[in-house]
Amino acid sequence: MHCAILKAEAVDGARLMQIFWHDGAESLYPAVWLRDNCQCSDCYLHSAKARKLLLEALDVNIRMDDLTFDQKKVYITWPNGHYSEFEANWLKKRCFSQEARAGLQGELFLPECQYWGSELQLPTLNFEDVLNDDDHAYKWLSSLKKVGIVRLTGAADKRGEIIKLGKRIGFLYLTFYGHTWQVQDKIDANNVAYTTGKLSFHTDYPALHHPPGVQLLHCIKQTVTGGDSEIVDGFNVCQKLKEKNPQAFSILSSTFVDFTDIGVDYCDFSVQSKHKIIELDDKGQVVRINFNNATRDTVFDVPIERVQPFYAALKEFVDLMNSKEYKYTFKMNPGDVITFDNWRLLHGRRSYEAGTEISRHLEGAYADWDVVMSRLRILRQRVMNGN
């Protein structure tokens, strides 16, 4: 972005700065915001990209004492003699117009979301390419954010491969099941995933108040028959539910449900949480699905008259997930790693037969969306700059 200032002036009793740009656009900036964001070394620590100015020292009713400009910068003197400079590009990027704010938020959070159903073309990349090449790593994480799932092929059929992916993004998310965990049938299993039975559509770990955002599953050994993976785009299904039955959508997005998980693994644990099955942001957009029927508690903290309507709404939601139109079925092969958005996708597994030895083995891990998005922003900057 290369912006040129045509004119800058103080308005509204010097409480606002107005800029006229060479491209014909206009921008307004509050004086209090400008003073708060002074970029001088007394007010801003450039080595940490962090504000030093204390809010206690900020006059919220401040006015500009003097304002000058050239094409590239604005120069402001404040009533106490403090002096600030602001670059044109920096100001234009932070314009308060609705269009500019939406554009910057899009750059920061990359909200583009591609909904899908049974027609999904599963994004696929090579495991080693993702580890060793920034362009491929960027494609991996940008597709993960946009589509919600990416398959990586070519990993070794041994434990430890997803630890490499964790290091590629930064670090993995430790839970009560460990840094990584083994999905295989176990005697006296402490999780339904560690059985050979069918797993219905679910998100992992809603028993935590902050469920892991991304899940990584590496296929080390696969059964010959059964064990197919099933996934569904929860955000897409939520949209259809809202269209088909707004009342059911309203119930699931307003009713807090208790989840529990008690046992021993990495250490002993007794976890409780409360979530709405469909979690919305302040604009009414779905931001997370919290649903695991296995760990949904017997405790249900609602008035009795709301119990049956809740079950009816939840059943309709689950029936939609299981319709052929929305679910996608595939089988992992040894060396495959699937990485997916645990806040958006629900996943399941078809049953398989137990043998005298372990016939199916996946290694799993979690990552936090903050860590993934951090790496995605860094990779995006590198790729866009050609570094």
Curated annotation (Swiss-Prot):
Alphabetical GO CC annotations of the entry are: cytosol; mitochondrion
Q: Which residues carry this modification: Phosphoserine?
A: 351
Q: Which residues bind Fe cation?
A: 202, 204, 347
Q: Which family does it belong to?
A: Belongs to the gamma-BBH/TMLD family.
Role: Catalyzes the formation of L-carnitine from gamma-butyrobetaine.
Q: Where does Zn(2+) bind?
A: 38, 40, 43, 82
Location in the cell reads: Cytoplasm
The EC number(s) attached to this protein equal 1.14.11.1
**Note accompanying the cofactor annotation:** Binds 1 Fe(2+) ion per subunit.
Catalytic reaction equation(s)? 4-(trimethylamino)butanoate + 2-oxoglutarate + O2 = carnitine + succinate + CO2
Source organism of this protein record: Rattus norvegicus
Q: What is this protein called?
A: Gamma-butyrobetaine dioxygenase
- The primary gene name is Bbox1
The record ties this protein, via InterPro entries, to: AlphaKG_dependent_hydroxylases (IPR050411), GBBH-like (IPR012775), GBBH-like_N (IPR010376), GBBH-like_N_sf (IPR038492), TauD-like_sf (IPR042098), TauD/TfdA-like (IPR003819)
